[in-house]
Amino acid sequence: MKKRYIWLSLILILSLLLNVACTSAPVSQNPTSGDSEDLSMTVSGSETDYYSYLTRYRDVPAAAESLSAELVEMSSEVTAISVAEEMGWLFSADSTVTFRVQVPEKAYYHLGISYCYTLEDTRNLPYSLLVDGEVPFDEAENLQLKRIWSDEGAMTQDKQGNDLIPQQQCLQQWQTVQAADYAGYTVKPFRLVLEAGEHTITIRGGQGLILGQLVLDTQKELPSYDALQAEYAQQGYQKVTGADVYLTTQGENTFQKSDQTIYPISDRSNVATYPNDPVVVRRNVIGGSAWAESGMWISYRVQAEQAGLYCLTVKYRQNESIGMAVSRNIYINGEIPCAEFENMVFPYAAKWTQFTLGQGGEPYYVYLHEGENIITFEATAGALSDILLDVSDLAAEMNSLYRRIIMVTSTNPDTYHDYYLDREIPDITQRFATLSARLAAASQQLASANGVNSDKSAILLRVAERMATFAEDVNEIPDGLTSFRDDITVVSNWLMECRQQPLQIDYFTFHAKEYSLPSANGTFWQRVGFAIRRFFATFSSDYQSMQDYENGDNTITVWVNSGLDQAQIVRDMSLKFTEEYGINVNVNVVQGGLVEASLAGNAPDVVIDCARGQPVNLASRNALADLSQFPGYEEVTGRFAQDAMVPYTYNDGVYALPLTQTYLMMFYRTDIFEEMNLKVPQTWDELLEVSAVLQRNNMTVGLPYTAISASGAVNLGVGAKDLYPTLLLQYGGDYYNQELTETMLDSSAALNAFKTWTQFYTQYSFPLSYDFNSRFRTGEMPLAVASLSMYGILSAAAPEIRGQWEMALMPGTPQEDGSIDRSGGASGTAIVMMDSAKNKDACWKYMCWFTETQTQVDYGTRLENLLGASARLASANLEAFHRLNWSDAELAVLDAQRRFVREIPELPGGYYTSRCIDNAFRAVVYQYKNERVELEKANDTINRELERKREELS
């Protein structure tokens, strides 16, 4: 026990020393801008990231003057173009433009980029930055340039009086920005250190980017507030006076913004938000989680009848990131007026708060000229930037140390075995001690930045204590290895949460000091009256139905077979369809129950997000309309992959249009593959070779397997549940004969594929059940096959490994001609028309509209805006898929794999196919039964059920 106290005391002293060395000035209501960036801590994670780059060049001074860069070279795909009377260079896929600059002496510069873009796409513009032909640090490989967006027209209401989300439009305007990390771990633009002499700077970008000039900028110092006031006095500017002098701008009335995700939202929790209504939806505030990433900005137009110096008060709320202050840069007419308006801190506020910018009880004054002024609020990490950078490095170090430990102990160590970790990893004690000290220091810095000890600082302190325990006694590590892995996840989640800077704004007001601000939350009796009205309104609200119109011949009913968020988006978008076609649409959210509704005569007209196995089952009972009989069918199906209609075809009729199409991809950790000198496997034999290397180091490979359930057997189909369809197709087999009357699981191809599939688990010990997200993040599973939808989950939930993983083509089977067959099945959802629909022509028009490119792009964009990257739409519309937020490199590999996708037919009774194959698999893997016997047994059972089903339906 005494030894433990000594260790903790030493670590606490070290953390205090580190804190003194690296903690920025405590954040007050008016943090001052500083040029210094904290570089004093030892970097122990990646050696090629921006943090390490800053450390190496910490003593390099800022440049004395700016430099213009001269264009010297461009790739052949780049063309000259004029936009708004300015010349630029239009990029196509993977284009480069190179500039030359002469540097007088060694210094660091910020890179200013002038750019515009075409309007054919709505994605942010990815680019890479190279200096002298090399990427200077990891973050420079994956950067983004933002577009400019605005609301398209004034807010409109639906038939019930609810405000609708305004359509977002992309504006084609030139911008000049400084290169920075879009992930938001740094506040300031990148520092590019250049030696004296000639250098080249290359921008590598993709489709739609229009590049203007590059400028190497110097570090610009903002004046202090006192210096600004002195300048105002010199200009003769006067403070406005009078209790009735104020200019209020509602937060929802934006001018322009950086992201289409930022749109008005509704708050009915407070009577004082304006405008408000206890019954209908009023989109009366803006921000929150949709305005949380560093670099996101919103601008407003403020009309000032009188020029002068105004106070600025913002009515805001920050109740999403508990206990955390957030920061914003505030621009007046394109400029941050003084250092105090950079990284302006908005303290944690669970309730709406009137926040007057100022210090020591005195407000700040800023100048507005007569007429229109542009006010911009930009999200920034503020004082958290250095902490985020350091904790990001610590997460990388924890991951690295964990992987090194499991190479010795495995992921399930024997707690009674002495692994001699201090001999196998000589610096392990020092590494854990340093981790503990740095985590404790980060916890203290965070508490200082927020002004209080929040749960976020407590999390870091708890992890620091465990690291101290391991440093004190390495024999505690095997027993605590699971806790260590959990700590890595905790720190990674901490990073993901703390980089968010959510802020909601109801309105902001420029005013004279004498102006009396209204209450942020209303009076007691106002709140009581509003709450009572809200309570009684709940009795008349139907939260499942979004019915806007009376039922009739010109009205169709659409069911959305997913969530309420998706249904709300469909409903809002359907109003545009009604405007265009004059057909009314009522939308309901319903999960399941379609067969029952059909039998009861209460079926809808159209169903969105119908599960893969449902259309053929319903069509076999004459419940669906044959879409191939409608005009324009061939043109509509041209939007999809060639065989996308196969799962929805029955007896020469087609009974659904595909909405989504998902298939398997291979995911791998590029950093671990580089460390271990591994190549991405192209075939299954190569995958087994990689697996052998990983398993020798106590890592593993993940292959998809989902235990069958009753609903899964009926709904999900067989295409991408597990690896068997992939292997079967690659081995030259098929599930069914050409007449679709029997299975072909008695073929040699089917048996060989089945043996290969089961042997992954019986001979090579691949895990059947695992948490892919967690294991991939920690590096335990650096290679895995998963649905392409996993891309969005990793992008949203694993920021600490950003840039350290990629998608690749599926492993394949070599062919006699030397090619590799990477065939695989697919899954997805569809849109169907019920045969009971009275106005089938109207339903067909709706289905055509909903599956067309622009509608799918709008739907996918709104979905991702609302729910994040994890909800990215895998649209079956090929053009729409290309216009969603994928990079060119990602699209290239996704398109390449899609060309190998072979859709598998769905049959009445097909649920027995997946169930029986799964039973055979489990018998072999769990009970060590013979593969041939079990597969033949499954084949006979399936064929009997298919025959029984045909007789029943005939």
Predicted regions, residues:
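Hinge/lid segment of periplasmic solute-binding proteins
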Residues: F539, Y543-D548, R612-M665, L688, ...
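Extracytoplasmic/periplasmic solute-binding protein
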Residues: Y650-L659, L664, L688-E742, A749-A750, ...
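Extracytoplasmic
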Residues: T23-Y515, A826
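Extracytoplasmic "Venus flytrap"/periplasmic binding protein-like
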Residues: M573-D643, P647, D671-Q682, P782-L783, ...
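Glycine-centered hinge/linker elements that transmit conformational signals in sensory
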Residues: E739-S769
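Short, well-ordered beta-strand elements
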Residues: N551-G563, I583-N588, V606, Y655, ...
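Long, aromatic- and glycine/proline-rich binding clefts that accommodate carbohydrate-like moieties
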Residues: M810-G812, T861-N919, A923, E951
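Extracytoplasmic/periplasmic substrate-recognition and gating elements
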Residues: E105, Q306, A798-A871, R899-E903, ...
